[in-house]
A protein has these predicted regions:
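Glycine/Thr-rich phosphate-binding loops of Rossmann-like dinucleotide-binding domains
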Residues: 16, 78, 108, 170, ...
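Short secondary-structure capping/turn micro-motifs that flank functional sites
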Residues: 14-15, 45-47, 106-108, 143-145, ...
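Histidine/acidic residue-rich metal-binding segments in metalloenzymes
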Residues: 1-97, 113-136
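Oxyanion-binding "anion nests"
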Residues: 99-101
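Short, glycine-/Ser/Thr-/acidic-enriched flexible segments
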Residues: 13, 75-76, 103-106, 139-142, ...
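His/Asp/Glu-enriched, well-ordered alpha-helical/loop segment
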Residues: 36, 57-68, 104-108, 118-206
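Active-site microenvironment of metallo-dependent hydrolases
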Residues: 173-249
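Short secondary-structure transition/capping segments
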Residues: 19-20, 50-52, 111-113, 146-151, ...
């Protein structure tokens, strides 16, 4: 099998039973070929769309949670608390990963709502507090689902921390993980990823002095390095402002 990941989109199936079968089929293929799983799961406002429950159950039983990601899970943001917190206990047991796409989820969800109008995101803040791996991503680059997508992860992070309300001093120190280390865990490359000695020199350089600065300013990328070689680099932006101090020499 030439693919790296087996995917599915059960909530698009014409009936619940077909969606459930697609989850079993996805897991069967992934186990057969030892591939990762990434399911576009419950990308809907409908709180009765609960395919994430079945996906979590089957990967929990197979011990495959760390190699599985449930993307979007927008309906989980509409679920009642008693169900949500019961499920989060099970998510912790399976160690399944989650991905939210802040711009797409906010743009596409809540279309049938009047007011109050849902934000469209899954329970990002609660996942972080519970120690469940959650990452931010963008799955639409200038396409019909989200025409404004350009792959700028600092923009994704900025939107995500507003929509998920994660801007306390303690949260800001962890927010960059949402577009770095947490994503690496979703891709199951956490052992290769990072700045530790002996790991490949793959990183970007942002124009800022701290996590707070680069997040607040949506800092531009000054350099991108891949295996120790520059893919590109540029100088920081400089400004010149003419000042008239009214002094004659």
């Amino acid at each position: 099998m030439g693919a790296d990941v087996v995917g599915g989109i059960p909530h698009y199936e014409p009936a619940r039973e077909f969606g459930e079968k697609s989850i079993y089929d996805t897991l069967e293929l992934a186990l057969k070929y030892d591939k990762l799983i990434d399911v576009h799961c419950d990308e809907t406002d409908d709180p009765n769309s609960r395919f994430v429950e079945l996906l979590n159950a089957v990967v929990l039983m197979e011990g495959y949670g760390e190699k599985t990601t449930a993307s979007h899970t927008c309906s989980f943001g509409s679920a009642d608390n008693s169900y949500a917190f019961r499920m989060m206990d099970l998510f912790k047991k399976s160690k399944m990963n989650f991905i939210a796409c802040p711009t797409e989820n906010a743009y596409l969800q809540g279309r049938q709502d009047t007011y109050p109008k849902r934000r469209g995101l899954t329970r990002v803040k609660e996942f972080m507090e519970a120690g469940i791996n959650i990452a931010f991503a963008q799955d639409s680059i200038n396409d019909p689902w989200y025409p404004m997508g350009n792959g700028n992860m600092m923009n994704i992070l900025d939107n995500g921390i507003h929509l998920a309300q994660i801007m306390s001093p303690e949260e800001i120190e962890k927010d960059l993980d949402l577009i770095t280390y947490n994503g690496a865990r979703c891709m199951h490359i956490q052992d290769k990823y990072g700045l530790d000695a002996s790991k490949d020199a793959n990183f970007i350089v942002l124009d800022g002095d701290s996590s707070f600065d680069v997040i607040r300013n949506r800092a531009p990328v000054l350099a991108s390095v891949r295996k120790g070689e520059y893919l590109f680099k540029r100088k920081p932006v400089e400004y010149e402002v003419a000042l008239d101090l009214g002094i004659k020499y």
